[in-house]
């Protein structure tokens, strides 16, 4: 998984206070700028950030695992520093299991949605997405 993410993401230490800790923390920062006549006159700058936390579950994924990761990511999003250049941040929690994932767990993860606007969206927004990966049958649930 690390090899696939290497092209677009930088790997960093996970943020402090995450419990459970992700096995891998990947960050992608993208900046878009519009200039007028030369690069010294910038009309606007926007930042789009993406964060991916990969969790390897040794046994079956449980509802408590999803709830714990959801609460941690909610806290991270709430503490996200934003400025006038921030446009969007997407947080993805990927839980990977060698055991088959129950349909009830997939429904629980699908129901977990979180969106936060900063300053009525004037300083951007942040979204949380869950991905459950079932290695036993080779399927990803989004």
PLM ranges: what are they?
Residues 22-27, 91, 121, 131:
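The transition from N-terminal targeting/processing segments to the mature protein
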Residues 60-78, 102-107:
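Active-site-adjacent loop/helix micro-motif of nuclease/hydrolase catalytic cores
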Residues 1-57:
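N-terminal, charge-rich interaction modules
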Residues 56-59, 96:
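Histidine- and/or cysteine-centered catalytic micro-motif in compact active-site loops
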Residues 82-108:
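Nucleic-acid nuclease catalytic cores
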Residues 109-141:
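Charged, structured surface patches that assemble and position nucleic-acid processing machinery
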Residues 39-42, 73-83:
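Short secondary-structure capping micro-motifs at structural edges
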Residues 48-51, 88-92, 128:
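Short, surface-exposed beta-edge/turn micro-motifs
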